[in-house]
From Swiss-Prot:
The lineage of its organism: Bacteria, Pseudomonadati, Chlorobiota, Chlorobiia, Chlorobiales. Its EC number is 6.3.5.2. It comes from Chlorobaculum tepidum (strain ATCC 49652 / DSM 12025 / NBRC 103806 / TLS). ATP binds at residues 231-237. It catalyses: XMP + L-glutamine + ATP + H2O = GMP + L-glutamate + AMP + diphosphate + 2 H(+). It is an enzyme of class 6 (ligase). PANTHER family: GMP SYNTHASE [GLUTAMINE-HYDROLYZING] (PTHR11922:SF2), GMP SYNTHASE-RELATED (PTHR11922). GO terms for cellular component: cytosol. This is GMP synthase [glutamine-hydrolyzing]. Pathway: Purine metabolism; GMP biosynthesis; GMP from XMP (L-Gln route): step 1/1.
Length: 516
């Protein structure tokens, strides 16, 4: 990111909330990055952060192979805030003691701020309030030069900070999770740490991001031509518009119709992308894809066939382009870096691992620093219509992973018709924008039914709708029963070949959002 931005580094110890910490910081208007906990201090110093945050984690600091930060992190001259496991790592590093607690805390707890001590900048304007706990260990002995600034009924040491001879270190620790919404003053507390203690001036915004990216794209691409595979989804659309702002008609977008799109998708996508002024070529390769997928039931084989065929089609539509635009997001980048150590195998994300090396295309990933909600905010700043920005995520393999079992044109058409009814009803009921993602799945089973006094033996369709903020975790959407009944009745009566509709009430984890 631009060196002029003041940034915060979050060291990840494996917490499920690490990304949430980074997002909360950005909501305050400050740029944040996530690094593995084992990142060396000299690497951190090179990024010139104004503050460092140690995340929570699932382990115990007294384990033989406990995750610990580079000790020199505390000598970089910037404020450090430890959250949950991060607090315990601080206590251990400075000579305190951490033990397993006989009274674990999970969920809401009442935090009592220690008003007897001289005012803590961290707790300025923060009263006694509910906080979110998730820990089984506790600090039983404070390190020398630290004081307790808050407690709960089960955690005498709920918050600590350096003082006296160690005050200049500006090291703070919280046993609770300020990044979680259930911690009522959590965002205010983070703001106190970043602005009042670290002295950071908020300068991160969609507008500043766009300005920097346009400059960077111009610098990287120069006079070269650039190609972008566009799908009509949020990520590829925002990425394409952003690159187009930088290099104009030197960007060539390719939209491949693989025959696995939603009903009338190709026509709709071309229509709503037209006002954006992008140079787009529509390639109809549906016969090629469906021919190769005919009769294939294995989801892994489907993905491999689709991936290989897409590469071949895409390659034929590339001319003298030197760069490839991809809509890689920050969670994709984070998932590719292990917190377990530098010796662990790095996972190659699907966005960057598929195109053959012989194409010799260099990557431009203008969104790789953004979370999904930030992509939408950037899209709004770019003037992209809300209908495009709020489209639900759609898997790369398309309907191939929503038609379970053998893939045929007929089964795809059945799914398209049913899914269109589901989505139309969500929109007309004002529910579409209230769920993260909604879709239909055609199951590889049939069931007995009765229609018009005749016995039927036809397909079962599953409806899936989930609520989420980033797709990393998700809960099933509690749609009204009357709404589900209406959708079910319409599908059974209007879509030939379906006689039973079910609703998926699984959350992620343990289930995934998609069925395949």
């Amino acid at each position: 990111m631009a060196t002029s931005l003041q940034s915060v580094i979050v060291l990840d110890f494996g917490s499920q909330y690490t990304q949430l910490i980074a997002r909360r910081i950005r909501e305050i208007g400050i740029y944040s990055e996530i690094f593995p906990y084992h990142t060396k201090a000299e690497t951190i110093r090179a990024h010139q952060p104004k503050a460092i945050i140690l995340s929570g984690g699932p382990n115990s600091v007294y384990d033989e192979k406990a995750f610990m930060p580079d000790p020199e992190v505390f000598s970089l001259g910037v404020p450090v805030l430890g959250i949950c496991y991060g607090l315990q790592a601080i206590a251990k590093h400075f000579g305190g003691n951490v033990e397993s607690s006989s009274k674990q805390e999970f969920g809401r707890a009442k935090m009592l701020v220690n008003h007897d001590e001289s005012e803590s900048l961290l707790f300025r304007d923060i009263p006694d309030s509910d906080v979110w706990m998730s820990h089984g260990d506790k600090v039983t002995q404070l390190p020398e030069g630290f004081r307790v600034t808050a407690s709960t009924a089960n955690a005498e040491v709920c918050a600590i900070e350096s003082f006296g001879s160690k005050a200049a270190l500006k090291v703070y620790g919280l046993q609770f999770h300020p990044e979680v919404q259930h911690s009522l003053y959590g965002k205010q507390l983070l703001s106190n740490f970043l602005i009042d203690i670290a002295g950071i001036t908020p300068d991160w915004s969609p507008k500043s991001f766009i300005q920097h990216q346009i400059e960077e794209i111009k610098r990287v691409a120069g006079d070269s031509t650039v190609v972008c595979g566009i799908s009509g989804g949020v990520d590829s659309t925002v990425a394409a518009v952003l690159v187009s702002k930088a290099i104009g008609d030197k960007l060539h977008c390719v939209f491949v119709d693989n025959g696995l799109l939603r009903k009338d998708e190709a026509v709709k996508v071309m229509e709503f992308l037209k006002p954006l002024g992008l140079n787009i070529s529509l390639v109809d390769a549906s016969d090629l894809f469906l021919g190769r997928l005919k009769g294939v039931a294995s989801p892994e084989k489907k993905r491999k066939i689709i991936g290989r065929t897409f590469i071949q089609v895409f390659e034929k539509n590339i001319h003298d382009e030197k760069f490839l635009v991809q809509g890689t997001l920050y969670p994709d980048v984070i998932e590719s870096v292990s917190v377990k150590g530098p010796s662990e195998t790095i996972k190659s994300h699907h966005n960057v691992g598929g195109l053959p090396k012989r194409m010799k295309l260099k990557l431009i990933e203008p969104l790789r620093e953004l979370f999904k909600d930030e992509v939408r905010a950037v899209g709004r700043e770019l003037g992209i219509a809300e209908d495009i920005l709020m489209r639900h995520p759609f898997p790369g393999p398309g309907l191939a992973v929503r038609v379970l079992g053998s893939l045929t044109r007929e089964r795809l058409d059945v799914l398209r018709d049913a899914d269109q009814i589901f989505i139309d009803e969500l929109k007309s009921s004002g529910l579409y924008s209230k769920v993260w993602q909604a879709f239909s799945v055609l199951l590889p089973v049939q069931s007995v039914g009765v229609m018009g006094d005749k016995r039927t033996y036809e397909n079962v369709l599953a409806l899936r709708a989930v609520e989420s903020t980033d797709g990393m975790t998700a809960d099933w959407a509690h749609l009204p029963h009357d709404f589900l009944a209406k959708v079910s009745n319409r599908i059974i009566n209007e879509v030939r070949g379906i006689n039973r509709v079910v609703y998926d009430i699984s959350s992620k984890p343990p289930a995934t959002i998609e069925w395949e």
